[in-house]
Amino acid sequence: MLQISHLYADYGGKPVLEDINLTLESGELLVVLGPSGCGKTTLLNLIAGFVPYQHGSIQLAGKRIEGPGAERGVVFQNEGLLPWRNVQDNVAFGLQLAGIEKMQRLEIAHQMLKKVGLEGAEKRYIWQLSGGQRQRVGIARALAANPQLLLLDEPFGALDAFTRDQMQTLLLKLWQETGKQVLLITHDIEEAVFMATELVLLSPGPGRVLERLPLNFARRFVAGESSRSIKSDPQFIAMREYVLSRVFEQREAFS
């Protein structure tokens, strides 16, 4: 379980996050949404251990987070892939740093690429891939170390609508298959409502938890209902419009 208690963070002396309290149970998919400047990415970087926090605590499985660790896999919007390495070697890179024997890490990379639908692309280079394929590589790399927690920072924001829909459904299928804790940062309201088992709305200036919404649309998808059916459901549309109104309220209040 991920547990965040009374978390405060600032940047250059300016408060960015204030009194954040969140929990993420095993097998849940938590989505964090809010207007620009609410500290979404800062929160992910704190959980990843990339930057320090000033007060409070972040714990994963009862252990305080004080820096990066293999128990947390991270996927970024810009992928962060190495262009001079082929797809397989990109996925295996973290395993290489961890000292995993070559044949074992290449087999793990092969299995992860199979999971994300890139079997047969092992020897291709990053420049030969589409945006969606590059994000699949990024997800495969993050999963290769078998982390407890998968962190994704607006991973589909730069993709076209069709590819974004494909990646959303892929991530939900992987979430179901692996049973991992997943925390997704997004600015896309429809994506947030569709993918979350719990949706956290942050307010800006500094970021605070405005509202927490338990949702079941992701579970309906992994149970077999199509994404198109879910997104056209009046319940889904009503929730999407409610969340949109809350985000607009916050943006107007702090503009």
UniProtKB/Swiss-Prot annotation:
Keyword Cell membrane applies: yes
Compartmental location: Cell inner membrane
Domain ABC transporter: 2-229
UniProt-recorded name of the protein: Taurine import ATP-binding protein TauB
Subunit comment: The complex is composed of two ATP-binding proteins (TauB), two transmembrane proteins (TauC) and a solute-binding protein (TauA).
PANTHER family named in the record: TAURINE IMPORT ATP-BINDING PROTEIN TAUB, TAURINE IMPORT ATP-BINDING PROTEIN-RELATED
Gene3D superfamilies: P-loop containing nucleotide triphosphate hydrolases
Annotated Pfam families: ABC_tran
This protein's encoding gene: tauB
Superkingdom assignment: Bacteria
Function: Part of the ABC transporter complex TauABC involved in taurine import. Responsible for energy coupling to the transport system.
Catalytic activity: taurine(out) + ATP + H2O = taurine(in) + ADP + phosphate + H(+)
NCBIfam families: PRK11248.1 (NF008421)
SMART domains: AAA
